[in-house]
Amino acid sequence: MVSETPEDAIVSRPEAQGCVFGVDEAGRGPLAGPVVAAAVVLGDAYPKGLDDSKKLTAKRRAVLDEDIRKTCGWGVGVVDVEEIDTLNILGATMRAMSLAVQGLAAKLGGDPDMVLIDGNLTPHGRCDLWQWEAQAIIGGDGIEPAISAASIVAKEWRDRIMTEAAQDYPEYGWLSNKGYGTAQHLEALRLHGPTPLHRRSFAPVAQQELFR
């Protein structure tokens, strides 16, 4: 997080009206795998107990993910490693968010009146796909239910991608670390080098490339 609060960020829950999408991302920090964003519009019977995905147990998160996708409108945007290395991780995250909102709007047959985004930045002016009114909320995944739901869907979606990828590259420990730079992952990078799913624009991966 930057040291200053940008003009497009607030620190409290807004009084949004009309059709409101919540948006959050998963996977900005890992050394491998895509960045994933989800957009969610809550249904009338949305699941109770929504919270920041990082505060939930894996079991509870999986149950909520299934319930959200059954009772709410949702869309997912996935930006792969090649685009991350081309755009940088911020640009890739903004693109994933844009794709998620675009996908959900297409499902619903109409645009949202407002998009609430976890964090301190919106894709407005940062991604050419973005065309919706948006508000960034610092800590929004813990205070705005639609964002909480999006954080859960994004996290579970990305975890499934990395669990599948771990079958092809078991040495890197992706079943447990999901691509983050744990000691096991860094040691595997040193021994085996980067895979096609590694982010070569990230320093620990780039350093291993230099020595191979």
Curated annotation (Swiss-Prot):
Enzyme kind, highest EC tier: hydrolase
RNase H type-2 domain segment(s): 18-212
Endpoints of the signal sequence: none
Recorded catalytic activity of this chain's protein: Endonucleolytic cleavage to 5'-phosphomonoester
Keyword Nuclease: yes
Keywords: Cytoplasm, Endonuclease, Hydrolase, Manganese, Metal-binding, Nuclease
Protein name, entry field: Ribonuclease HII
This protein's encoding gene: rnhB
